[in-house]
């Protein structure tokens, strides 16, 4: 059966604080570095979301605000594609866009 891999590597300092985050998608020959990862996994047995959030020590508060608000907006797009509930997706997205404008991150 075909499979694809996404490789995440977190390099830490001696206190285990992330310094560098690298990612690689070998099947499409893409790789790079990033400052933050927000990974959500669905545990079907527990009927619950598992989260893994990692960010480097040089990521600024403003970058984190922008990253999180943009992530929520993209989750709205995912929600709409998965459920066809455009009304709720649009409502949440507009709410987050308003917050992002207030915070001056968009």
Go through each PLM region and give its residues:
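Active-site and channel-lining beta-strand-loop segments
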Residues: 6-25
């Amino acid at each position: 059966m075909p499979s694809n891999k996404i490789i995440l590597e977190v390099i830490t300092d001696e206190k285990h604080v992330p310094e560098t985050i690298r990612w690689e998608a070998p099947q499409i020959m893409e790789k790079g570095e990033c400052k933050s990862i927000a990974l959500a996994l669905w545990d079907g047995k527990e009927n619950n979301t598992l989260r893994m959030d990692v960010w480097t020590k040089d990521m600024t508060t403003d970058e984190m605000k922008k990253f999180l608000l943009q992530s929520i907006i993209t989750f709205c797009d995912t929600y709409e594609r998965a459920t066809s509930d455009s009304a709720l997706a649009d409502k949440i997205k507009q709410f987050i866009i308003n917050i992002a404008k207030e915070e001056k991150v968009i």
